[in-house]
Every structure is written in structure tokens, then in C-alpha cells.
A protein has these predicted regions:
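Non-catalytic C-terminal accessory region of glycerolipid acyltransferases
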Residues: 1, 702, 864-984
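AMP-binding/adenylate-forming catalytic domain of the ANL superfamily
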Residues: 70-90, 102-106, 624, 635-638, ...
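Conserved pre-ATP/AMP-binding loop-to-beta segment of ANL
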Residues: 143-146, 283-309, 315-316, 330, ...
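Conserved AMP-binding/adenylate-forming core of the ANL superfamily
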Residues: 148-202, 222-229, 319-328
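Conserved AMP-binding/adenylation subdomain of ANL enzymes
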Residues: 328-345, 355-397, 412-416
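Gly/Ser/Thr-rich phosphate-binding loop
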Residues: 396-400, 412-506, 520, 528-529
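Conserved ANL (AMP-binding/adenylate-forming) active-site segment centered on the GW(Y/F)…HTG consensus within
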Residues: 488-509, 547-578, 611
Length: 984
């Protein structure tokens, strides 16, 4: 007789564990429990973490037996609580074909184990559906590898330290748990007002792990504009409805001034202190799930991952909605375009509140397992050589920056500060976020060629927040492509006709390359029709990384995604970038922002070109020049105005500078500016990322306040404090009145309820017939609800007339649910309640006298017996009422459904009548003790009939199983339509 072949000889424990997890993962995905998939580990609790009830376990057992070709004892359904328990049971179970099975060698078993492990992780990082998955993947697969080398600016100078992928994830997990303890809900918006620091990375990752949404905003950096800063940031925070603001010590006072201006903001917290509290917090009890992993905090690809507020260079800031799917699509496309990998090294100084810094310089590199050397923007701006020295030190290979950064390096870095510098490792120097100056590209390449920098490494790119980040990227290793076009034809007719070699008046544009993989770009006219090559038009784009719109801003969204650009199902809508461009030889040349272009004498004038010409004048501050147009109604055209900052105060000197600007612009454009206005330094408003606010500059110019001096910082802070105090008092007074009324109502409710329940309970106690007890209770509830001033509206009651036994299935929101249901629907059914409810004073008597069912949630055998009891009642013609969620929480949303009721429907043919409850959660939210007055609505949907199948046993057949899932999904969808809540 051959040796008995068991799984031990066929697979080692690692392979068996991976296979078990694979089977469970497949079942969870089939059940639609996508939120549970990220929680799946060898030690996950099958019921609490993964939501697998008794019937799901029965199905799982059958699948494991098939996968491993063995039989498992029936008791495993009740006794196995984790995948690890199932693995151990499998390793000790005999195979079905033991007589015929051949024992495998240790080598073959090892190969099998490795193959199973490879199969489970073969898709790797590209299987990640959310940023949470990315963080977890890197923590598991690259825990010991350094991800971030952060140089912080502190009071004592610079400090550099590192974070591995594992350390980042661990710190973020603790931060997420602390955020959950502080009441940040899933989907809640948390603002990050932080400088470049360890706290930013940990906090941002922690917010994501908590299932919340980061909202990065820039910290205050100019004391003389603190009032303007407060107005702009409070507008952002109000639009985002943030619940928590994380800041740093030096900005905490300013951050607290914002609180009275933002109604949704509950607290302002020092991020360092929050992280410190998180580190000191006790770990969860053995077997307990961390707070941030409970409820609905797991995210889906379609959930919002980030609100990226545009810097507002042409208008008010708008919150770009970016989902996990949007971000991952862009990050992967960019990585493919620049061939990013773990062998690369990123070097960045970009601000993390800007999309190029947050998404481009960090999250994309996190996805590809790339280490990043990080420094602050201030460190770069004060000493730009530090950026290049970081490339030398870390052997950096990739970086992105706006055009001005490369220009700053050319103008500010002295040879003595970069002796011995080696930039030969730098293979991709991305230049974007603002118009790319071809002269800057050439100057940078020439200036640093002696240090090993190659012109071919330069990559002028195009992107915007509405596309997540990038839209176009040029080919690697080619270098910049500059197109010189005839100025007259381009500015008057919009045709990009190549200029002759000797044309000194030619206008130059830099190619931004071709669309990133899986994305499209088209150039259209005002009617949305595509224009031919070398014809200027409006740049539209589409693809998986394009935003769905602006957060809580429907009007702006309609302009961004016009209704006439909507396409057929399965295709992405075209998005209007707001930029003008032309296409030549398949590459995109961006010419300027639509709102910024000046039309003078029938010619299009591009502000950035005017500003570049004016910057050549001696005495003008570089990067502090704005050109814009003013309507000249008499001439029927626009006047060209140039506003520039200068430190020169003398009238004669200022006049000479203005004359120089006029001459340079006239020579370059062929027409003079109508006005040149010189103003003091610091007058021109800029975005947080250093972009010029042209529209705001224009409005200040028209109001004659552009060069007006700002009040001292202490005056602005005092003013903000005074208005904030008034708002705080007003808000707190109204909140106190509201709270007082709630307390009075709560006390009134308890008095009324006590006076009602004692006689009602006494009478019900002596009624022996459960139907009569139900009718009496429904009548008595009319009195209670009238006294409570809580109206109950019922819709769809006609569906109760459906003949035969029925299963009523409702969402579960609070302990209060049963009362309005008995009032609104009567009690022509038996409730199925958890055992804990039956033990409550008075309530237990009602349940017993009216013949309702109770079950023990913690006992799988009890749940299976309950399913059998349900079927027996239904076959007798009695209807039942179930809460398929099995429990409720304080959090809004429809939780996953247990399958017991749906199995009963399939086995007996009884229809499901979905019942939607709305208002009961607000009346008595879990975790609160005082009810709040509200209206309750009960909506019944048409009955859902099970389709005939072949099974009728406790172990569903394949057709039964799929019918259970269909019934469950149809019921959830019907309930969510009228409940006012979303699916979790």
C-alpha cells in the first residue's frame, strides 16, 4: 500500500497558506467585499475583519476542499476563525485520492511553494487599486529599503534623516489610528498645512490609511499678507468641508485664526504632537482590529483619494477631485513614459502642497519603489546649488521642476560652490508647471555641461491638476525640440508656419512631447471640431487619470467638461484644459492660457513672451513681471499693460527702466506696450507655487491698489483675531442653544417613553397571541410617536399585499429602528433580532410575546440553525423581517449583508421586499444617549423574486450560490436608493 499523500507532502505550509488566501480573496471579490480584500492576512478574523458569515464559510469550506482535493470536518465551519486556522486544518486533513497519489520530493514541493507565492504576487504593484494598497505593498516587499532621505529646516539648522518603506507604513498606521480616535470619519477631509518634513509624509500616508482624504494647502510664508492668506485658505477649507487641520508649531497661531471662519473645522492640531501621541498610544488588544481598519475605512479605486486645489493663477482656487484610480493611472503612465524603476533616485525640493511635488516627486516614486532625497523649497531658493549637490551626493537620476528653477540655477550658482560636482547620473530633468523658455533650456544645458549634465536629459513636459499630473511627455534621450514659427502668421491667423532660418522676429515654442500612454489629446476650435496640424486651438485631453470635476462646484465643472464632450459608455469624457496649443508631427506645443492671451490689433499676444522680453531690462526683478490686456472700447481692441517690480526708487531711474522695457517689448513683438507700470518689490501676487496671479494683478491694477502698502502683520493678525472671536462667539452661542434644546428634548423623550412603555409592556405581557400583541403594540406606538413629535411617512405599503410569505429586508441604523417599523408597517411578520436585544429590559418581553426570533451572532451553529428556522417559518406561510447587516454603527452607509435571509429565499421561493429606513440614524445615532427630533421615512420597494435553482440543502450548489449573490446585490441596491446613505 502506498503512503498516504497529505497536503503536508504535497505542499509546505507557506504554499498552503498562500493558496488558502488566494481562495478567500477570490470569494471576497465574488461577494463584492472589495473593502475586505486589503484586510486579508493569515490572521484576519473571518467574521469580524472579512465579513464571512456562516453561509459564506460553508461556501468557503467547499472551495477549499476542491482546491486541495480533500475533506474537512464539518466542525471547521464553526471552529476556524482565521485563514491560519484553515491552513492548519488543511495540513492535517487526508487527501481524497490518497491511495493513488504519488509523494513529491522536497525539491518539487519547494518549487510548488515558490510558484504559488509567485502566482499570488505576480501582478505585483500593478495589481494595487488604491494608494493604500501601494503603501502596504511597499511595506511588505521593500520594508528595509530606504524610501525617503529628508532634510528639514529646523530652529537649530538643517537635520537629515531617513524613512524606509516599512517605517513610513508603520508610522502612518499609528497616525491613522490616532486620527480615527480623534473622530476623523471615513471619507472625511483633513487639511495639511505643513512644510516639507517627516510630519507631512507620515500625516499624508496616515490620512490615506484612515480612509480619509488629504487636502494639502500651503503654509503661511509672508507675514505682510496674512489677511489675504486667511481669506484664500478659509475659502478652500470651507469648500472642502475639512474636519481637521494639521499644522506645525510656527503656524499654529495662524491656523487657529482660520477655525472660526470654517464651520466644519472641529480642531486644529500640531501634526508633530499628533504623531507623538500616536506613537505613545497603546496597541490594540490581542485579536482586536485597529480603529483605522474598522467599518468602511477600506477604500475602493473609485473613491476620492485627494482634493488638489488649483493654485488659482487665473481665478479662484478650485478643488480637483482625484480618485485612487485617477492617480494610479497617471503615475503608471508617467512611470512608463520615463521608464521609472527602483534603481532610479529622485531628488526634489518641490512643495508638497503642489501636484508636481506631491504626486510627481513623491507618490509616483513611492509606487515604483524609488528612493527620494527631499529638501525644502526655501533651502533651494536660498541656495539653489544644494539641489545639484544632492544629485551628486545621492547619484540622483530624475527630478522635476518649473522653468524658473532651472533659470535660477543658471543665474545664482557660482562655480566655487559646485567644484567637483558630477551630474552625469541625471538622466531625466523634467521641466513643467509653467511655460518652458527655450532660452532657459539652452542656458542650463551649456552652463552645466562641464559637470556631466547632458542636454538630452531635458524633458519639457505638460500637465495640470485636472489630469492628476501629466498629459504629455517627450521621448527619452532626445533632448528639447524647439519650433520657430512665423510671428505675423501665428499671432494674426493662428497658423504655426515654420519660420525661415534668418527670421529674427520668429516666435519659439517648445514641444511638450506626445500624450502619455492610454491618454489622448486633441486640438479643437471653438465649436469643438478638431483642427489640422499646425493650427492653434484649444487643448482637450481625456484618459483614465482625468478628473470627474471640481469638488462642490458644479458651475466650474460644466465649463471643464462641457456636456457636448460626453462620449459613449466605456469612453472617457474630453476635458477642456483651458490652454491653447497646436500639434506638429504628432507632438504638442502649448502656446498659453486661454484667459491670459491678449488680443491687440487682431494679433494674439502671449503674456509669458512679453514678460520674458521685459525681464531683460536692467533693474527689473526677474520673475516679477505681469503682462495683461485691458479693454479699449474706443479702439475696439485691448491695451497691452506691463507691470514690473523694481527696487529703484528715483524718478529718473524708473523712467529709464520703463523706457528700456518699452524698447525691448517693441523690438521683440513689433508693437509697443500701451502702459508700463513699475511697482515696489513684493507687490505682485503669486500662487503658493510661485506662479504669477495675472487676473488678480489686473484687478488690483484697476482698483489702483497694486502697489498700496499692506498693514503691518500684527494689525492683520489682530483684525483676524477680532473677527474670528466674533464668529466664534456667534457659533458657540448658537451651538449652545441648539445643544440645550437637544438635551431638553432628550429628557422629554425619556419621560414620555417611560410613561408609555410601563403600561404597554404590562398589557403585552398578558396577551398570549403574538399577532394580537403585535396589533396592540402598533396602535400604542401611534400615541408615543404623536407625543414625540416624530412623524413617520410610509411609501410603497401596497407591496405588503403580495400574496404568501415574504422576507422584509431593511437597513439597520440604530436601536430605534424597530419602533417606527412596527408603527408604519404593523407587525405581520416576525423580527429576527440578535441575542443582546432580547436581554434588554422590557424589549425582551416584547420579542418573546410577539414570537420574534433571537440568535447568537458569535455562534456559527446558532446562525445556521436560525437559517433553518427561517425556512421553516416561510414554508408555514409566515413572513419574517431581517436586518441583513446584522449590526449597526454610528457611521452613515449600508454595510455588507449576511446571506442567511437570501438562502432562505432561494430555498423556499419567498420574495424579498427591500425596506429603506431614512432618519432613524439621526434620531438615535450609535454611541449617543439623547435622541434628536427628526422625520422618519420608510420606503418599500417592489418584491424581488428568487429564480428557480437546483439546490435545497444547507450547502448551496453553484447555481444557488450565484442566485444568493444576485438577490443580495439587488436588495442592497434597492435599499440604498431610498435610504439617503451610500454603500460601504
Amino acid at each position: 500500500m502506498r503512503p498516504v499523500a497529505t497536503p503536508t507532502t504535497q505542499l509546505d505550509s507557506l504554499a498552503a497558506r498562500e493558496r488558502v488566501l488566494e481562495v478567500i480573496r477570490s470569494l471576497l471579490e465574488e461577494l463584492g467585499s472589495h473593502g475586505a480584500v486589503p484586510l486579508l492576512t493569515a490572521n484576519s478574523q473571518l467574521d469580524r475583519d472579512l465579513g464571512l458569515g456562516s453561509l459564506e464559510r460553508v461556501e468557503l469550506l467547499g472551495r477549499l476542499e476542491t482546491a486541495f482535493n480533500l475533506r474537512l470536518p464539518d466542525r471547521i465551519v464553526a471552529e476556524a476563525n482565521t485563514p491560519e486556522h484553515l491552513t492548519r486544518a488543511i495540513l492535517g486533513a487526508p487527501g481524497i485520492d490518497a491511495e493513488e497519489a504519488e509523494p513529491e520530493s522536497a525539491m518539487r514541493a519547494s518549487v510548488a511553494a515558490q510558484k504559488l507565492h509567485s502566482d499570488a504576487s505576480d501582478a505585483g504593484i500593478f495589481a494595487a487599486e488604491t494608494l493604500i494598497d501601494v503603501l502596504r505593498y511597499r511595506a511588505v516587499h521593500d520594508a528595509e529599503r530606504t524610501h525617503l532621505s529628508i532634510t528639514e529646516d529646523t530652529d537649530g539648522g538643517e537635520r537629515t534623516f531617513t524613512l524606509t518603506f516599512g517605517e513610513l507604513y508603520a508610522a502612518a498606521q499609528r497616525c491613522a489610528a490616532e486620527l480615527a480616535r480623534r473622530g476623523v470619519p471615513a471619507g472625511g477631509r483633513v487639511a495639511l498645512m505643513l512644510p516639507t518634513s517627516r510630519a507631512f509624509f507620515v500625516s499624508c500616508a496616515g490620512i490615506l490609511l484612515a480612509g480619509a482624504i488629504p487636502v494639502p494647502i500651503y503654509p503661511p510664508f509672508r507675514a505682510d499678507r496674512i489677511e489675504e492668506y486667511a481669506a484664500r485658505q478659509s475659502a478652500i477649507l470651507n469648500n472642502a468641508e475639512v474636519c481637521l487641520l494639521l499644522t506645525f508649531r510656527r503656524a499654529e497661531a495662524v491656523a487657529k485664526l482660520l477655525k472660526p471662519r470654517v464651520r466644519s473645522l472641529t480642531s486644529v492640531v500640531d501634526a508633530e504632537m499628533l504623531i507623538e501621541a500616536a506613537d505613545k498610544a497603546p496597541p490594540p488588544a490581542p485579536g482586536a482590529l485597529p480603529l483605522h481598519l474598522t467599518g468602511s475605512r477600506a477604500r475602493k479605486a473609485s473613491d476620492i483619494a485627494l482634493l488638489q486645489y488649483t493654485s488659482g493663477s487665473t481665478g479662484d482656487p478650485k478643488g480637483v477631485v482625484l480618485t485612487h484610480a485617477n492617480l494610479l493611472a497617471n503615475m503608471r503612465a508617467v512611470g512608463e513614459a520615463v521608464q521609472l524603476g527602483p534603481d532610479d533616485v529622485g531628488v526634489t525640493w518641490l512643495p508638497l502642497y503642489h501636484d508636481m511635488g506631491l504626486i510627481g516627486a513623491w507618490l509616483t516614486l513611492l509606487h515604483f519603489g524609488t528612493p527620494v532625497a527631499v529638501m525644502s523649497p526655501i533651502s533651494f531658493l536660498t541656495r539653489p546649488e544644494r539641489w545639484l549637490q544632492a544629485f551628486h551626493k545621492h547619484r540622483g537620476t530624475i527630478a522635476a521642476a518649473p522653468n524658473f528653477a532651472y533659470e535660477l540655477c543658471v543665474r545664482k550658482i557660482a562655480d566655487k560652490d559646485i567644484q567637483g560636482l558630477d551630474l552625469s547620473s541625471w538622466r531625466a530633468a523634467l521641466n513643467g508647471a509653467e511655460p518652458v523658455n527655450p532660452e532657459t533650456l539652452e542656458r542650463f544645458a551649456q552652463r552645466f555641461a562641464a559637470y556631466g549634465f547632458r542636454r538630452e536629459a531635458q524633458l519639457p513636459v505638460y500637465g495640470l491638476a485636472e489630469a492628476s499630473l501629466a498629459v504629455t511627455v517627450p521621448p527619452l534621450g532626445r533632448g528639447p525640440l524647439v519650433d520657430r514659427v512665423d510671428r505675423e502668421l501665428f499671432t494674426s491667423e493662428g497658423r504655426a508656419v515654420p519660420a525661415s532660418p534668418g527670421d529674427s522676429a520668429a516666435i519659439s515654442f517648445v514641444s511638450s512631447g506626445k500624450p502619455i500612454p492610454r491618454h489622448e489629446v486633441r486640438i479643437v476650435d471653438e465649436q469643438g471640431n478638431e483642427v489640422p496640424d499646425r493650427a492653434e486651438g484649444f487643448l482637450w485631453f481625456r484618459g483614465p487619470s482625468a478628473t470627474s470635476g471640481y469638488y462642490r462646484n458644479e458651475a466650474a465643472t460644466k465649463l471643464l467638461i462641457p456636456s457636448d464632450t460626453q462620449t459613449q459608455d466605456g469612453e472617457y469624457a474630453w476635458v477642456n484644459s483651458g490652454d491653447r496649443a497646436y500639434r506638429a508631427d504628432g507632438e504638442i506645443y502649448v502656446t498659453g492660457r486661454v484667459k491670459d492671451i491678449i488680443i491687440k490689433g487682431g494679433r494674439n499676444i502671449y503674456p509669458h513672451e512679453v514678460e520674458e522680453l521685459a525681464a531683460r531690462a536692467e533693474g527689473i526683478r526677474k520673475g516679477c513681471i505681469v503682462a495683461f490686456g485691458l479693454t479699449d472700447e474706443n479702439a475696439g481692441t485691448e491695451k497691452l499693460v506691463v507691470v514690473a517690480e523694481t527696487r529703484e526708487r528715483g524718478t529718473a531711474k524708473a523712467a529709464a527702466i520703463a523706457a528700456s522695457v518699452t524698447e525691448l517689448v517693441t523690438q521683440g513683438l513689433g508693437l509697443p506696450p500701451d502702459r508700463v507700470e513699475l511697482i515696489p518689490p513684493g507687490s505682485i501676487p503669486k500662487t503658493s507655487s510661485g506662479k504669477l496671479r495675472r487676473e488678480e494683478t489686473k484687478q488690483l491694477y484697476l482698483a489702483a491698489t497694486l502697489s498700496a502698502s499692506k498693514p503691518p502683520a500684527w494689525v492683520q493678525i489682530a483684525k483676524l483675531g477680532a473677527t474670528g472671536a466674533a464668529r466664534t462667539f456667534n457659533q458657540e452661542f448658537r451651538a449652545a442653544v441648539s445643544r440645550g434644546l437637544e438635551i431638553l428634548y432628550g429628557l422629554y423623550f425619556f419621560v414620555i417613553f417611560f410613561l408609555w412603555i410601563v403600561p404597554t409592556w404590562t398589557i403585552v405581557h398578558f396577551i398570549k397571541d403574538h399577532r394580537a400583541a403585535g396589533r396592540f403594540t402598533s396602535s400604542a406606538l401611534k400615541v408615543l410617536f404623536a407625543l414625540m413629535r416624530c412623524p413617520v411617512r410610509v411609501a410603497g405599503k401596497e407591496y405588503m399585499e403580495t400574496p404568501g410569505a415574504k422576507i422584509y429586508a431593511s437597513n439597520h441604523t440604530s436601536y430605534f429602528d424597530v419602533l417606527p417599523l412596527m408603527l408604519g408597517l404593523g407587525v405581520p411578520y416576525r423580527f429576527v433580532a440578535k441575542l443582546e436585544v432580547g436581554k434588554m429590559p422590557f424589549i425582551g418581553t416584547f420579542l418573546d410575546q410577539m414570537g420574534h426570533l433571537k440568535f447568537d451572532r458569535t455562534d456559527p451553529h446558532s446562525r445556521l440553525r436560525q437559517a433553518e428556522e427561517l425556512e421553516e417559518l416561510l414554508r408555514k406561510g409566515e413572513s419574517v423581517f431581517v436586518f441583513p447587516e446584522g449590526t449597526f454603527t454610528s457611521e452613515d452607509g449600508i454595510r455588507p449583508f449576511q446571506l442567511g435571509a437570501f438562502k432562505a429565499a432561494v430555498s423556499t421561493g419567498a420574495p424579498i421586499i427591500p425596506v429603506s429606513l431614512a432618519g432613524t440614524r439621526r434620531f438615535l445615532r450609535d454611541g449617543t444617549f439623547l435622541p434628536r427630533p427628526t422625520n422618519v421615512t420608510i420606503t418599500l420597494s417592489p418584491p424581488i423574486y428568487p429564480r428557480p435553482t437546483g439546490g435545497a440543502s444547507n450547502s448551496p450548489s453553484s447555481s444557488d450560490w450565484h442566485e444568493l449573490i444576485r438577490l443580495r446585490d439587488a436588495t442592497r441596491e434597492a435599499i440604498v436608493r431610498h435610504s439617503g446613505e451610500h454603500l460601504l
